[in-house]
């Protein structure tokens, strides 16, 4: 990972997403990314039961723990860095959960327009 502080969708320093459960491509609590992150784990989502059930149904089980990968399994209300491509699909299929834009990496905007993200934002004033 680059030592450089990554930016959020507003061009500001990226804020931490979650330390419990510990999230992020680097398991550093932030939705940081690099060229090796093919899933682009950059959207800080507050997962809902609906989103988790949809995700499991379409092939990405985020509920079942996998301790061998440092994955605790998620429950309603957890914050987690989800894949931008996966979140874009959730929007299109009506299963998107809420997101924290100040905790969402600017890289997300390469895949999801800011206007779509704002519809699900928890942290707009």
Regions found by a protein language model. Give the residues of each.
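Glycine- and charge-enriched low-complexity intrinsically disordered segments
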Residues: 106-125
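Extended boundary segments
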Residues: 1-50, 121-123
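Short, compositionally biased
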Residues: 87-110
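Short, basic/aromatic beta-hairpin or loop at an interaction surface
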Residues: 46-61
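Short alpha-helix capping/helix-loop boundary micro-motifs
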Residues: 63-70
């Amino acid at each position: 990972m680059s030592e450089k502080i990554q930016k959020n969708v507003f061009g500001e320093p990226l804020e931490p997403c979650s330390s419990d459960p510990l999230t992020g491509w680097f398991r550093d609590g932030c939705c940081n990314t690099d060229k090796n992150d093919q899933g682009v784990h950059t959207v800080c989502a507050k997962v809902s039961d609906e989103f988790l059930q949809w995700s499991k149904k379409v092939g990405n089980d985020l509920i079942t723990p996998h301790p061998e990968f440092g994955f605790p399994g998620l429950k309603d209300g957890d914050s987690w860095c989800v894949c931008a491509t996966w979140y874009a699909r959730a929007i299109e299929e009506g299963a998107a959960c809420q997101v924290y834009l100040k905790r969402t990496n600017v890289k997300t905007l390469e895949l999801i327009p800011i206007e779509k993200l704002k519809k699900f934002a928890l942290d707009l004033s």
